[in-house]
């Protein structure tokens, strides 16, 4: 069992190790649906025509690229991650894009101590980050700090399916088959055992919405995707 003190270092080293096969495993585990989920989140991100979008724990850049594809008005996208191998892959994928509609900059930084001024971005977003954090309240406070008044927070995360029967089937797959796939396909059983473990104590979608409200966000809403296995939460900074 990983202690709360050890978790940040453990998670960073884990993502450094799985970076080369991260995209492949996401596609295998979700049958490609993770691309659709990111596009759905991206539509929520660009709905207010933001000038600056901050993608935290951007990984290999897929959410940043989805935002670039969905945006109707020009915007600047800043992708932040603490894993150099992940950022290297994001930059390589960006370089290979045929059409670069808007600027994307990738930066190594700690999502709990962002090197950005107060009220400097229009949207803060992230995909599959929250389960890996030790202190959600600290993270939400930092996101609230860098958002401009009227700014939007959009997060996409694995969740507990609300329908009991399907939840049992999902847990059977997630807790047993996913680690086996990690072992057989990419030889990273430990990382893909950590993945379902990280969900066990994570709040369900309604409770995550409550945590956002308690951290000062307003107009909080969420919707389930992937038969209730993931959820996108949307919240606004009023002042």
Residue ranges of model-derived segments:
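C-terminal alpha-helical "lid/dimerization" subdomain adjacent to the S-adenosyl-L-methionine
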Residues: 9-10, 156-211, 215, 221
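Conserved alpha-helix/loop element of class I SAM-dependent methyltransferases that forms part
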Residues: 21, 30-51, 66
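Hydrophobic beta-strand segment of the Class I
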Residues: 22, 124-125
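Class I SAM-dependent methyltransferase SAM/SAH-binding core
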Residues: 52-113
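Short glycine-dipeptide loop
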Residues: 73, 147-152
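A short acidic, Gly/Pro-enriched loop at the edge of an enzyme's catalytic core
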Residues: 112-123
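A short glycine-rich, Lys/Arg-flanked "PGG" loop and its adjoining helix->strand segment in the class I
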Residues: 137-149
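Core SAM-dependent methyltransferase catalytic element
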Residues: 215-239
């Amino acid at each position: 069992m990983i202690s709360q003190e050890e978790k940040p270092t453990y998670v960073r080293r884990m993502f450094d190790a799985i970076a080369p096969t991260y995209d492949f495993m996401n596609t295998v585990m979700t049958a490609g649906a993770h691309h659709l989920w990111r596009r759905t989140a991206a539509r929520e991100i660009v709905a207010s025509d933001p000038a600056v979008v901050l993608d935290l724990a951007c990984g290999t850049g897929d959410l940043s690229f989805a935002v670039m594809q969905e945006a109707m008005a020009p915007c600047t996208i800043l992708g932040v991650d603490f894993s150099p191998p992940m950022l290297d892959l994001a930059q390589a994928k960006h370089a290979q894009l045929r059409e670069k509609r808007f600027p994307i900059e990738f930066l190594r930084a700690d999502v709990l101590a962002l090197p950005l001024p107060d009220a400097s971005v229009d949207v803060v977003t992230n995909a599959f980050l929250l389960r890996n954090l030790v202190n959600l309240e600290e993270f939400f406070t930092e996101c609230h700090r860098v958002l401009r008044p009227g700014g939007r927070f959009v997060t996409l995360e694995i969740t507990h399916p609300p329908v009991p029967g399907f939840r049992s089937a999902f847990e059977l797959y997630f807790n047993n088959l996913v680690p086996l796939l990690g072992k057989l396909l990419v030889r990273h059983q430990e990382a893909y055992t950590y993945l379902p473990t990280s969900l066990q104590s994570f709040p369900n979608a309604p409770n995550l919405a409550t945590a956002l409200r308690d951290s000062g966000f307003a107009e909080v809403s969420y919707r389930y995707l992937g038969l209730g296995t993931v959820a996108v939460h949307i919240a606004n900074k009023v002042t």
